[in-house]
């Protein structure tokens, strides 16, 4: 089904994988070096066209367009305003697809929307009102273009199937673009994803995506690299099918994606009235990839990602045949994911040897596409979901899709079967809509199934869980009233209905400034919208207290700052910070704020020892070796340790919440994604790396760590950072900071990106 090549591989004429350089020469009659062949990837060409550094090893990228949704654009624009924003220099689309229900906090969600609308007018942007489209579907329909690059403040910013290299990053990276700065990275590796064969009837894009995620996540095969889709199997897939695979590449932890394009993508642009934005893309005659994943589409069967990660993948048939073993494995993994905070079991879902689920949902940027929903309607037509616990909801990804589904009868078929068809909303993907009952088990064609991502509150003793599946198998399960069923078991005649896009919907409702700013527009600030608090520059010496210690193999951004209803407070930095690590380590906020008292005293010109008594013996021990430490040259803050933090969302708040609570650093064995590490840096936090085994650390939660001359070490680009765990003695430890650009070092020295741009 899938094969991962050990090392790099050549692709000759877009069809033949060859690992031996001599064989390439024999096939082509010419000698091609790896260095030359690397420049023949589609990714290289697009990056080269957007790089202004003149150095293809150290890229400085200028994007063509930007996009954000309503739980990120407020913080981004507030940061940009504090840094000197006068006008959006490139198209910037603000969608309102996350806090759309306005069910939490009174007026605060709609207040954010009004902030967005007035900013779009004032600075020259585009505003997509609530329920019109989810962020990524609008981008596909209206923004993507062949050979273009788009940066979004959402991790699933992926439009590679349309020939657009798109990346999801934390808000500060968008701020840089808004201020006419660049996105600075080393040239990423490019991994070929070679598609062969053709999917069998009943297999959908989520099945292919989950198979790829299952093969590449744990081993980091594509981590922070570009996935480039090639091979004869590509042409066997519709545009919608490719889009459905592409959006899920984020769950592999790749940096971006790009696909070869053809007449099916050309037709997509024509349908959306943008034929001029199509560009044919293909790899060169001889292309070298840093790795290669071979995918035989014909062998893929309906898949399921069991709780609590998209990489926890099985075929549905495997689950049904080995039900007891699979459920036991899921429950054992849950002990780690949930820290034993609640009792979790799926055994009660087994009735007469069959697994029954409580809820089915098809939604958002992954599931809400036209073809997915049409296929679901074809499957469920003539069936009904029953009048018991099982519920089934479908969220088309945009109003134009919804309208076409109404016109072609798909909505009627779904509703007659008992399905509820709702508006374009990302809620089921991040815990703000269709939260199941306690102990319920939901199957969803959405992007993630992290703990509590469906909206349950662990700190209240609640637990529900989600398995990811394709829309087709979810509909098959719904047709069987919740009995887990692969779509390949259903005898269905798929209509294959043609899509018609009605552009009048957006023309009549979306505000588009066409790049014309109106500086006289007054921004509407809701009561919950607050400015970022002042942040200090990096001190000469740093005293850190470890205030949380996490030993999970991977820590997600959902654990660092929860999603769901918590997201409504993202316009208020200090208010949101109260929820930091609330599901993983409820005592974290209190510990961090206690340590922060010392730094606030320093900033007020007072003695930190007077407000934090426990600091007295710590400083006494430090001054035995460093007698000058503490005399106007020290900062005090908190740090967390996590094995591998930062998987999941691009949300900058995973870092900024730590910062506004006095965080100065993270310590990790590695960082799960480039975007989380960038968020730390942009908020002035040191991304320390330790080589120590997480089971044998030199420090523990509650310990103080002294980092002498940290400012000088950052300035001098020191390879290693010497620090001391403060106890009865000073125990030396060594950290590294990893590769950093000069600008990133300066941001840390200044204390945060806002300070950096203020000068």
What name fits each language-model region?
Residues 1-759:
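Fe-S-dependent hydro-lyases/dehydratases of central metabolism
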């Amino acid at each position: 089904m899938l094969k991962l090549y050990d090392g790099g591989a050549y692709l000759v004429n877009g069809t033949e994988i060859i690992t031996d350089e001599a064989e390439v020469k024999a096939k082509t009659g010419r000698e091609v070096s790896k260095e030359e062949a690397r420049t023949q990837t589609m990714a290289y060409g697009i990056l080269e066209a957007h790089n202004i550094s003149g150095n293809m090893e150290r890229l400085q990228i200028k994007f063509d367009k930007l996009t954000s949704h309503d739980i990120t654009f407020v913080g981004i624009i507030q940061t940009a305003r504090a840094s000197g924003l006068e006008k959006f220099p490139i198209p910037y689309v603000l969608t309102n697809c996350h806090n759309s229900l306005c069910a939490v906090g009174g007026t605060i969600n709609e207040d954010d929307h009004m902030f967005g609308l007035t900013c779009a007018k004032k600075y020259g942007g585009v505003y997509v009102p609530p329920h019109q489209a989810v962020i990524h579907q609008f981008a596909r329909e209206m923004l993507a273009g062949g050979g273009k690059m788009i940066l979004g403040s959402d991790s699933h910013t992926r439009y590679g199937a349309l020939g657009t290299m798109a990346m999801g990053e934390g808000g500060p990276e968008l701020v840089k673009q808004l201020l006419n700065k660049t996105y600075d990275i080393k040239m990423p590796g490019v991994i070929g994803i070679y598609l062969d064969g053709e999917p069998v009837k009943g297999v959908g894009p989520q099945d292919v995506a989950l198979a790829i995620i299952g093969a590449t996540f744990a081993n980091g095969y594509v981590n922070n690299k570009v996935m480039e889709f090639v091979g004869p199997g590509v042409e066997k897939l519709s545009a919608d099918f490719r889009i459905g695979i592409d959006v899920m590449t984020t769950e592999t932890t790749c940096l971006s994606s790009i696909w070869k394009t053809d007449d099916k993508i050309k037709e997509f642009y024509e349908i959306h009235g943008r034929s001029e934005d199509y560009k044919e893309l293909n790899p060169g005659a001889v292309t070298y990839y840093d790795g290669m994943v071979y995918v035989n589409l014909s062998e893929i069967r309906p898949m399921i990602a069991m709780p609590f990660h998209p990489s926890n993948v099985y075929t549905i048939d495997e689950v049904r045949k080995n039900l007891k073993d699979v459920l036991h494995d899921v429950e054992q993994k849950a002990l780690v994911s949930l820290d034993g905070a609640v009792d979790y079991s799926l055994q009660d879902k087994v009735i007469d040897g069959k697994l029954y689920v409580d809820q089915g949902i098809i939604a958002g940027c992954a599931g809400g596409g036209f073809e997915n929903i049409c296929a679901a309607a074809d499957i469920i037509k003539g069936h009904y979901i029953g009048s018991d616990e099982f519920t089934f909801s479908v969220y088309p990804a945009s109003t134009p899709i919804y309208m076409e589904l109404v016109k072609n009868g798909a909505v009627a078929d779904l509703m007659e079967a008992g399905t509820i068809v709702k508006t374009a909303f990302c809620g089921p993907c991040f815990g703000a809509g269709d939260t199941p009952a306690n102990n319920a088990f939901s199957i969803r064609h959405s992007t993630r199934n992290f703990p509590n991502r469906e909206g349950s509150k662990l700190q209240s003793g609640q637990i529900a869980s989600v398995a990811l599946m394709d829309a087709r198998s979810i509909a098959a399960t719904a047709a069987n009233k919740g009995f887990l069923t692969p779509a390949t078991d259903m005898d269905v005649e798929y209509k294959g209905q043609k899509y018609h896009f009605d552009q009048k919907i957006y023309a009549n409702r979306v505000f588009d400034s066409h790049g014309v700013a109106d500086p006289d527009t007054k921004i509407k600030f809701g009561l919950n919208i607050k400015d970022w608090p002042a942040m200090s520059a990096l001190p000469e010496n740093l005293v850190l207290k470890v205030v949380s210690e996490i030993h999970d193999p991977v820590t997600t951004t959902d654990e660092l700052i929860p999603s769901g209803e918590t997201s409504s407070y993202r316009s208020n930095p200090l208010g949101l910070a109260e929820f930091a690590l609330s599901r993983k380590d409820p005592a974290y906020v209190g510990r961090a704020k206690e340590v922060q008292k010392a730094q606030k005293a320093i900033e007020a010109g007072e003695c930190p020892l007077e407000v934090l008594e426990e600091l007295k013996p710590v400083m006494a021990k430090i001054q035995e070796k460093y007698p000058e430490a503490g005399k106007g040259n020290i900062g005090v803050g908190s740090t967390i340790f996590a094995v591998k933090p930062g998987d999941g969302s691009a949300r900058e708040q995973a870092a900024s919440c730590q910062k506004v609570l006095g965080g100065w650093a993270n310590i990790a064995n590695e960082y799960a994604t480039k975007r989380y590490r960038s968020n730390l840096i942009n908020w002035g936090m040191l991304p320390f790396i330790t080589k120590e085994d997480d089971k044998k650390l030199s420090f523990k939660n509650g310990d103080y760590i002294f980092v002498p001359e940290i400012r000088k070490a950052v300035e001098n680009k020191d390879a290693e950072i010497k620090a001391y765990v403060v106890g009865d003695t000073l125990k030396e430890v060594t950290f590294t900071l990893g590769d950093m650009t000069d600008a990133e070092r300066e941001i840390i020295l200044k204390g945060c990106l806002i300070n950096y741009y203020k000068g």
